[in-house]
UniProtKB/Swiss-Prot annotation:
It comes from Trieres chinensis (Marine centric diatom). This is Thiazole synthase. Its EC number is 2.8.1.10. It catalyses: [ThiS sulfur-carrier protein]-C-terminal-Gly-aminoethanethioate + 2-iminoacetate + 1-deoxy-D-xylulose 5-phosphate = [ThiS sulfur-carrier protein]-C-terminal Gly-Gly + 2-[(2R,5Z)-2-carboxy-4-methylthiazol-5(2H)-ylidene]ethyl phosphate + 2 H2O + H(+). The gene is thiG. It is found in: Plastid, Chloroplast. GO terms for cellular component: chloroplast. Catalyzes the rearrangement of 1-deoxy-D-xylulose 5-phosphate (DXP) to produce the thiazole phosphate moiety of thiamine. Sulfur is provided by the thiocarboxylate moiety of the carrier protein ThiS. In vitro, sulfur can be provided by H(2)S. Keywords: Chloroplast, Plastid, Schiff base, Thiamine biosynthesis, Transferase. It is an enzyme of class 2 (transferase).
Length: 261
């Protein structure tokens, strides 16, 4: 980034990278580790449900091979169908963060998904879990549909960000509801992270050009033919989109305006 002061603040933490990555769906551990390093991301989300309660070198070689002085763990509650399940996963996520040396890490990516077919977030369950976790001192990053009113309610509850989906998780369909995403971005006083559905670097750049504060990716990199190359492409796309947003695009005109060069 050209402007080194253009940082992302979530809760009481400040980050230089606006690209966050997921940790699943990679073909090999080597692909995952190399992609994470290449991306220069600083926030890595991990599904608590897929991890053992006690981390050892044998059962979590992937996590143990990462530098947690450079990465901030974002435990997620994926697989939770109710608010109660998500709350339990959030507390387990904090325990896992402690085992990685991040005792002060109370971040949680809140996912309450009651529909196993389409994997769309449950707004009622999300609100219920978010209210409880915020009161317990968690830094809550809720995954939601692109619903402007829901985003405002979650902000009012004290969530640290909102994370509206671009399109259904893992679909690679891109940004299906740009109008609602723009409304959320314009109305939010907390960071807006576009999460889910981004499949290409151009879509990541577009998210940032809209004014989003960051993007979270997983499948687009993990399932690319060459994940490491896609990780670099996404890193550059997010940086380019952010710079383009800060620079301010030219005004659109109804017809060509002649300019003397």
């Amino acid at each position: 980034m050209i402007n080194n002061s253009d940082t992302l603040k979530i809760g009481n933490k400040t980050f230089n990278s606006r690209l966050m990555l997921g940790s699943g769906k990679y073909r090999t551990i080597e692909n995952a580790v190399n992609s994470i390093i290449t991306s220069d991301c600083e926030i890595l989300t991990v599904a608590v449900r897929r991890l053992p309660t006690k981390l050892t070198n044998d059962n979590t070689s992937f996590l143990k091979s990462l530098d947690w002085n450079k990465l901030w763990l974002l435990p997620n509650t994926a697989g939770s169908q109710t608010a109660e399940e998500a709350i339990r996963m959030a507390f387990l996520g904090h325990e896992l963060a402690c085992q990685l040396g991040q005792e002060d890490n109370f971040f949680v990516k809140l996912e309450v998904i009651s529909d196993p077919k389409y994997l769309l977030p449950d707004p009622i369950g999300t609100l219920k879990a978010a209210e409880f976790l915020v009161k317990k001192g968690f830094t809550v990053l809720p995954y939601i549909n692109a619903d402007p009113m829901l985003a405002l309610h979650l902000e009012d509850l004290g969530c640290a960000t909102v994370m509206p989906l671009g399109s259904p998780i893992g679909s690679g369909q891109g940004l299906n509801n740009i109008s609602n995403l723009q409304i959320i971005i314009e109305n939010s006083s907390i960071p807006v992270i576009i999460d889910a559905g981004i499949g290409t670097p151009s879509e990541a750049a577009k998210s940032m050009e809209l004014g989003a504060d960051g993007v979270l990716l997983n499948t687009a990199i993990a399932q690319a033919k060459t994940p490491e190359k896609m990780a670099l492409a996404m890193k550059l796309a997010v940086e380019a989109g952010r710079l383009g947003y800060l620079a301010g695009r030219m005004e659109k005109n109804r017809m060509q305006v002649q300019v003397l060069h």
